[in-house]
């Protein structure tokens, strides 16, 4: 479907390829480089590709995609981060529980898919963000004054007669933003229970 409320299927190789076609049509560049196989047993070449991030609830669905290569079979074992799950065609997947779904946001409850813990609710909708190089940017604004430290030395009081508790806090600056909307795509899927 085209509306979030009609989502009732897991990610498929066809849907992934449609997302990749969209990025390529916008001339998005790959983020990762080729990883060559090694003489070690059962290692494989990994194509250059885009990066996709999603909830770890989708691990099983991604692993079941045709052509999935787990990180354990990467030739050089060079991962993007500790949470990289694997690669399918020219997409490398990073999964983590921090990427949460829209609970009960999809089609009517179906025992096949996760439904936010409520047996009467709708299917949970999981976003998959896929992006190319320089689709977004971020920077910590730094110089000698970027970190502002606040220190409150301990003082004796009725609640702290020995003056043992003080506080220390810091503030800093950070900026991020989308640099090219055409180089980021979002697919919305259900996750198999």
Predicted regions and their residues:
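Sequence/fold signature of self-assembling virion shell proteins
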Residues: 2-37, 48-53, 57-193
């Amino acid at each position: 479907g085209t509306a979030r409320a009609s989502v009732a299927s897991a990610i498929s190789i066809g849907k992934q390829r449609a997302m990749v076609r969209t990025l390529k049509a916008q001339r998005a560049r790959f983020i990762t480089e080729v990883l060559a196989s090694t003489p070690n047993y059962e290692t494989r070449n990994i194509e250059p590709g885009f990066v996709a991030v999603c909830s770890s609830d989708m691990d099983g669905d991604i692993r079941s995609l045709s052509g999935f290569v787990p990180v354990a079979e990467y030739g050089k074992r060079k991962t993007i981060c500790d949470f990289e799950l694997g690669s399918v065609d020219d997409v490398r997947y990073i999964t983590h529980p921090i990427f949460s779904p829209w609970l009960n946001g999809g089609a009517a409850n179906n025992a096949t898919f996760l439904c936010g813990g409520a047996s009467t609710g709708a299917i949970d909708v999981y976003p998959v963000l896929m992006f190319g190089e320089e689709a977004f940017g971020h920077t910590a604004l730094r110089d000698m004054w970027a970190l502002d430290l606040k220190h409150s030395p301990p003082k004796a009081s009725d609640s702290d007669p020995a003056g043992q508790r003080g506080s220390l806090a810091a503030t800093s600056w950070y900026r991020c933003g989308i640099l090219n909307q055409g180089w980021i795509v979002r697919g919305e899927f259900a996750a198999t229970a």
